[in-house]
A protein has these predicted regions:
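Conserved NTP-donor binding/palm subdomain of two-metal-ion nucleotidyltransferases/polymerases, i.e.
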Residues: 2-138, 144-383
Length: 383
């Protein structure tokens, strides 16, 4: 039996629901027939890995086996499952511990030099997950409360004093880049790229004001690490997801970041303010679709003040299109290495994603296009 991508995606979504502690859609049941081949299990595992959810899907499989809803004879082959478990231990759980250690060490450096370090996205999101170690640990995004220049100078001097070959890369928009241990660190001097769209400078002023709040923090291995306020993190997560979705793609892991954030911090968010701000900058359409996916596809409870509105058939079709694009982007070609083919590739991708840009932004696409061209001219390495 040959299964379609949509069927495998639906099985994947069911396993994600179970893996995060939710039940299946009411009235449905998990179906894996005895004809589910090792190759199909491999394809399912590859989808989970692309989405950053290998650990969550494995958790879902464990729920099914434990509850007797997936007979062991229909489970994947023992050796295949052992390899999957090994991957989760190595790439998720062990790496998460290294991630925490790196964050603590970096915060310790800044604390000892008189700087305050706030983590954005990554670790701040992981703290909201039921199993933080089952969220993939990638880059470390930090905000130093406007002290990026002085902090980079101090860090650069420290690198030299240590005889380290590490350098601070200034070729990117809105943040510098360096490596701490084996983790790439993005040290933000702006929360978003103010050159990419005309409205971004105005939105950045809102982020900067919210970024002054230093009342939220945790201790990581004895070092103080600051966290964004609920309003800052909520706005930042939506804006970051929008930027990646409209330009190229996002993963279901990013959807879960938003869902777990709302689940844990929803009572702290000033929802009327956030919705007004999203509407002002044209982000509310994507926000509505994202919330619908979280509630209807992943089983999260809706926020009372954000009850899902009665939706048209057009909205439901749009939600399905967004969901399928998250799972398998409509434009999924590989980026060429050479400059001219890469520039042509970016233009074709921009045109293919026109429907996403209309969903996510108010501004004219061509206004954004020329802003983007100027953005790349300012930092040619971003092409």
């Amino acid at each position: 039996m040959v299964r379609t991508k949509t069927t495998l995606q639906d099985i994947f979504l069911q396993l994600v629901r179970l893996g995060i502690g939710h039940e299946l859609v009411p009235g449905s049941k998990f179906q894996v027939s005895s004809s589910f081949s090792p190759e199909e299990w491999t394809e399912l595992q590859a989808l989970a890995e692309r989405q950053g959810l290998s650990a969550v899907v494995l958790d879902g499989l464990d729920v099914l086996v434990r509850d007797g809803r997936l007979p062991r004879e229909r489970d994947m082959e023992p050796m295949q499952k052992k390899m999957w478990i090994g991957q989760v231990l190595q790439n998720y759980e062990y790496r998460h511990e290294l991630y925490r250690q790196a964050i603590a060490e970096l915060a310790g450096f800044y604390n000892s030099h008189g700087f305050k370090m706030m983590v954005l996205k990554g670790y701040a999101c992981a703290l909201d997950w039921p199993k933080p170690e089952h969220r993939p640990s990638g880059d470390i995004d930090i905000w130093l409360f406007g002290e990026q220049i002085a902090a980079d100078k101090a860090l650069g001097s420290w690198f030299k004093a240590q005889g380290s070959k590490s350098e601070i890369d200034n070729s990117h928009h809105h943040h510098t880049v360096f490596y701490w241990r084996d983790f790439m660190v993005e040290n933000h001097y702006d929360f978003i790229n103010v050159h990419a769209r005309r409205s971004n400078a105005r939105l950045e002023r809102i982020f900067k004001k919210l970024g002054d709040d230093d009342s939220h923090f945790v201790e990581v291995y004895g070092e103080r690490v600051y966290l964004p306020s609920a309003n800052l993190h909520g706005l930042f997560l939506i804006r970051h997801a929008v930027a990646h979705f409209a330009a190229a793609e996002i993963t279901l892991r990013q959807v879960l970041d938003w869902a777990f954030f709302v689940e844990k911090h929803g009572s702290e968010v000033d929802w009327p303010w956030l919705v007004r701000t999203l509407e002002e900058f044209g982000l509310k359409g994507f926000f509505n679709v994202l919330n619908a996916i979280c509630v209807e596809e992943l089983g999260f409870q809706p926020v009372e003040s954000l009850k899902l509105e009665v939706r048209s058939s057009e909205f439901l079709k749009l939600k399905e299109r967004v969901l399928r694009d998250i799972l398998e982007p409509e434009f999924s070609e590989e980026t060429p290495q050479r400059l001219l083919p890469r520039a042509w590739f970016r233009y074709r991708r921009w045109q293919a994603n026109a429907w996403k840009q209309r969903l996510c932004y108010k501004e004219s696409r061509w206004s954004a296009f020329w802003s983007g061209v100027w953005n790349h001219l300012l930092k040619p390495s971003s092409i």
